[in-house]
Amino acid sequence: MRRSVLQLKTVKSKKIEGGRDAAIFEEHLKSFEDEGMFKLAHIAYGFNPGAVLTGNIVEDERVWGSTEWGIGYVSPFDAPPHGQDAKSHCDGICLNSSVWLDGVQIMDEGRITDPYLKELAAFRE
C-alpha cells in the first residue's frame, strides 16, 4: 500500500510526504505557480455504509472510513462572498483514513475513535 501524507497548518499545505507519488503530486501543484493551489478547499468524511469505490467521485467520497480532500479553487457560491482564488482544483480520496482535529484523533485507519462520533456510528462498526 502506498502512503502519502498531506500535513496542513491552518488552510495551507505545510508538507506533502510519501515517496514518488507525493513528489509527483507536489510538482503538479507547483506547476501552476499559484500559492492558492496549496490551500485546503474542503474535506469530506465518508460515512455511507452502502458506498463502494467505483471511480465516480460522487460515490467514492462517501465510502465508509474514507476522507476526500479538495485543494485549490473554491467558487464564491460555495464560500461566500469571494470564494478562494486558485488556478485549478483537485480532489483526492484516502481510504482507511486516520484523522486528528486539534490534536484529538477522531478516526484511526477508517475506524471512528471519537466517543461521540463512535456512538453515532454504532450501527456500522
Give residue ranges: language-model regions.
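Metal/cofactor-centered catalytic core regions of large enzymes
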Residues: M1-E125
